[in-house]
Amino acid sequence: MPNEMRKIVFTEGELQAALVNYALRTNKKLPNATINNILVEAKEGVTATIVYMRDGTEEAKSVEFTPNDVAAALILYCSTRQIPLPRDAKKVVIPIEDSVGMIIKIDTHENS
């Protein structure tokens, strides 16, 4: 039986919304400042760093998200937007340009 694979690509704005929502729900402290950009890096999984605008003479602040944080944020984002994700499927986060995507692989082989 064939396997099913889906790819969901998130815009930079969707990634930002996912990370901020996740941070608020998990009590991760975020600065009260304007977001400048999000850096996405592939190192032992996909990490994301929200970089904030400099506020006067202060250095730019940033908040890092681990690969598990990024995956959880995207799954939560899909759940709150009613984007279906199969519970038992393997989910892998990949970097795509200035944002991320999620590959969902559904193994339809039954153990006989």
Locate predicted features.
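Intrinsically disordered, low-complexity linear regions
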Residues: M1-S112
